[in-house]
Amino acid sequence: MLSNSVNNNNNNNNINNSNSNNNDSNIHKNVKKLMVASIFGGIMSSLIVTPLDVVKTRLQTQNTGSHINQKHVFKGTLDAFKKIYKNEGPLTFWRGVTPSLLMTIPSATIYFTSYEYLKEYLYQFNDTEAYNIYTVPLVAGTLARIFSASVTSPFELLRTNSQGIVLQNAYKNTVAMAASSSTATIGTIPLSSEQRFNSFKLYRDIVNNVGIKGLWRGLGPTLVRDVPFSAIYWAGYEVLKNKLMKSQIDPNFSRNSKSPFFINFIAGATSGTLAAVLTTPIDVIKTRIQMSAQQTLSPSLTPQQQLDFIKKNNSSIYHLKQILSQEGWKGLTKGLVPRVAKVSPACAIMISTFEYIKQSHIADDN
């Protein structure tokens, strides 16, 4: 009896070890598939929606200059598209696409892969529908976004500044021409070759002025914006996908079932739109903080004044007060239309492409 018991235990241990090894093997296989899916989806969405991101950044930062009235540089989204196309050329709409792609590859890989594995890990603790649909996406989405945003923050800083630099250069040109032309308008002056954006110079200036930590300028507001966005998005996506599948296609749909491309597309676009609308005010503040990285410290300032200057420009409260006092509540909604127009298709393209590649490749392996 004892011998049989020992043999049974050994057999069970061997089976468990075999299952564990198989699971580890599947995890390594799936990591590669998830990485391919997330990278491909991220690249596709970046190339398609970058023009909308450029317009959003311009609208959010056009009032950051001083000394002359910049309120009518761009009157709205369509006006921004027209003026940028007319005065700067169509390629300007893809300004920042290189740092955007550099950011997309590690960000999408870390974000989606982390989300998938955190989700599978959290599923072990409960198997109720409410837990799987609401709690798991909220927690997994939050943790995955914190990790990916922290890693890619320097690339986000570069992308934001490369898209907004033209506006501030145009402002400098306008000031120089103001004495000879009373009709000079910001956004209508062509840039000189010397004013092309230099990413290395930006990083060097930031490090020289505020140290290496300056490359993570805006990370706080980015997390404040992206963490709730991620939680809202994933919870909304999972809930909507679940409801659409059960009502339209499969009443017995579960988390392990496949969902078709168009269901993922609709759920991604809808949840992305909701999350974008709710987090736009934070996005405006984050953009202002990151654009302030271009401001250099005056050598005439004392060390304490320099420290105060840096703290002020890194403060979300300071920029919030500035926006409210100079632009009112509407200032917090600047760039809402292009942001939603960018985020909605980006979320739809990203998640539907990701799910399609993930499901097809993992299914092939199985």
UniProtKB/Swiss-Prot annotation:
Pfam families named in the record: Mito_carr (PF00153)
Protein name: Mitochondrial substrate carrier family protein H
Lineage, uppermost ranks: Eukaryota, Amoebozoa, Evosea, Eumycetozoa, Dictyostelia
Solcar repeats (start-end): 29-121, 132-243, 259-360
Keywords: Membrane, Mitochondrion, Mitochondrion inner membrane, Repeat, Transmembrane, Transmembrane helix, Transport
Function comment: Mitochondrial transporter required for glutathione import into mitochondria.
Keyword field contains Nucleus: no
Region (Disordered): 1-26
GO CC field: mitochondrial inner membrane; mitochondrion
Biased composition (Low complexity): 1-25
Domain of life, source organism: Eukaryota
Biological processes per GO annotation: import into the mitochondrion
PANTHER family: FI19922P1-RELATED
